[in-house]
């Protein structure tokens, strides 16, 4: 048994929702005759999602959603199980794009996207794919933002379900998943102490909240930078310090970006960093930390540790960048905890099944996943934990419906 198969077997023990879905639908096989194209961080948990979809009858074609997040041993294990895989860990963007194209060559009926690349390419460079494409399920904040922008231009041609905007996704995956996995990656790759350090978190959305929460739990002094005044007030009320980035970088031991935006640090911010400061990105794309600026102002670049690049700046200070500025928890770690992704991937499967049943009456726009599916996943999770909750009485239901 290779390491990839061992990893998949391990996660399968801790994904009760996917196991339950496979048990419920494997005889009916509702996806029989349909192709699901996936662009997703290819590691053990996503591999198990692909396997579960295949148990529901789908032909699954999968590639990575980030050049550095594919785990080659897992990709090989998936191939051995009959899944079509076009992916390998690479620093070459052209190979990454080539693999996206290969997935689209299979003319998928449904796309499960992570960041929106497959969907955007199918609407721009590969429009023939749209003839067969029935709908898209998008996993990430970044991807949903891109596809809503596509919708606003009037160019979106298929219905999209924003799985990211489901409560059972963002309240758990974005917050607890990102919080734990980001710090797991930072600590395993630097071996540095967090307690007593100044941690700057750029962006206080659900991902930023999780990163800040776990940093505080590790004993750090947490500083949040924001452009949204409401989120800034939230961060203050949660007990964190808020200040502009240009001030925060002067005292930062760690800077972690989670804004979903570009160029979160300026050249001046980088030059103001302390000697030995560590930079990590928890956003989907490698645009939040301006690596090109680091390259321009560095007089020396060197590998300090695996996944850690040192840059000696023109002012004599050295700063360290993790995972080339890519998504640190996946490019330099194993991603979110297994049980968290069990929730998100249950939502993904139900999104595909919803599209299968309803795509003909859906317009080409971005939809929320229906509340009843969110609630179904929540109840499945409670059942897997053996937890019971109260139910409203009929009197209570009448009271909530009344206006007098």
Swiss-Prot record:
Any one GO BP annotation for this protein: one-carbon metabolic process
Keyword field contains Protein biosynthesis: no
InterPro entries documented for this protein: Adenosylhomocyst_ase-like_sf, Adenosylhomocysteinase-like, Ado_hCys_hydrolase_NAD-bd, NAD(P)-bd_dom_sf, S-Ado-L-homoCys_hydrolase_CS
One term of GO molecular function: adenosylhomocysteinase activity
Cofactor(s) annotated in UniProt: NAD(+)
Family matches, as CDD domains: SAHH
Function recorded in the entry: May play a key role in the regulation of the intracellular concentration of adenosylhomocysteine.
Protein name: Adenosylhomocysteinase
Binding residues annotated for substrate, in chain numbering: 114, 139, 169, 173
Pathway given in the UniProt record: Amino-acid biosynthesis; L-homocysteine biosynthesis; L-homocysteine from S-adenosyl-L-homocysteine: step 1/1
Cofactor binding, note field: Binds 1 NAD(+) per subunit.
Family to which the UniProt record says this protein belongs: Belongs to the adenosylhomocysteinase family.
Subcellular localization: Cytoplasm
Keywords: Cytoplasm, Hydrolase, NAD, One-carbon metabolism
Record keyword Cytoplasm present: yes
SUPFAM superfamilies: Formate/glycerate dehydrogenase catalytic domain-like (SSF52283), NAD(P)-binding Rossmann-fold domains (SSF51735)
Tree of life domain: Bacteria
Classification via PROSITE patterns: ADOHCYASE_1, ADOHCYASE_2
HAMAP family for this protein: AdoHcyase (MF_00563)
Class of this enzyme: hydrolase
Residues involved in NAD(+) binding: 140-142, 174, 203-208, 226, 261, 282-284, 329
């Amino acid at each position: 048994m290779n390491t990839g198969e061992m990893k998949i077997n391990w996660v399968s023990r801790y994904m009760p929702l996917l196991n339950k879905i496979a048990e419920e639908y494997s005889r009916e096989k509702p996806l029989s005759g349909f192709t699901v194209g996936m662009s997703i961080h290819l590691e053990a948990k996503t591999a198990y999602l692909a396997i579960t979809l295949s148990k529901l009858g789908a032909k699954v074609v999968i590639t990575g959603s980030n050049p550095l997040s594919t785990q080659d041993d897992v990709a090989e294990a998936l191939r051995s199980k009959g899944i079509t895989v076009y992916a390998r860990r690479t620093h070459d963007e052209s190979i990454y794009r080539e693999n996206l194209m290969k997935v689209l060559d299979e003319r998928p009926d449904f796309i499960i996207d992570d960041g929106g690349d497959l969907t955007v390419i199918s609407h721009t460079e590969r429009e023939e794919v749209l003839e067969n494409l029935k709908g898209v399920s998008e996993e990430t904040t970044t991807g949903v933002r891109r596809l809503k922008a596509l919708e606003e231009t009037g160019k979106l041609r298929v219905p999209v379900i924003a799985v990211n905007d489901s409560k059972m996704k963002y309240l758990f995956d974005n917050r607890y998943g990102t919080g734990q996995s980001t710090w797991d990656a930072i600590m395993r790759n630097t071996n540095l102490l967090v307690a007593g350090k100044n941690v700057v978190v750029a962006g206080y959305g659900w991902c930023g909240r999780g990163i800040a929460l776990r940093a505080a739990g590790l004993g750090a002094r947490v500083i949040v930078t924001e452009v949204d005044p409401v989120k800034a007030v939230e961060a203050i009320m949660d007990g964190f310090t808020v200040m502009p980035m240009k001030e925060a970088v002067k005292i930062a031991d760690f800077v972690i970006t989670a804004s979903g935006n570009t160029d979160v640090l300026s050249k001046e911010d980088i030059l103001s960093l302390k000697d030995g400061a560590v930079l990590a990105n928890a956003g989907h794309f490698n645009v939040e930390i301006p690596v090109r600026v680091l390259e321009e102002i560095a007089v020396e670049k060197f590998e300090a540790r695996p996944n850690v690049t040192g840059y000696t700046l023109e002012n004599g200070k050295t700063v360290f960048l993790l995972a080339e500025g890519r998504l640190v928890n996946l490019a330099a770690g194993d991603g979110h905890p297994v049980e968290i992704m069990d929730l998100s991937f249950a939502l993904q499967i139900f999104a595909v099944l919803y599209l299968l049943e309803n795509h003909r009456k859906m317009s080409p726009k971005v939809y929320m996943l229906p509340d009843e599916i969110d609630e179904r996943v929540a109840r499945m999770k409670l059942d897997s934990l053996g937890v019971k909750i109260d139910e409203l009485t009929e009197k209570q239901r009448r009271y909530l419906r009344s206006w007098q």
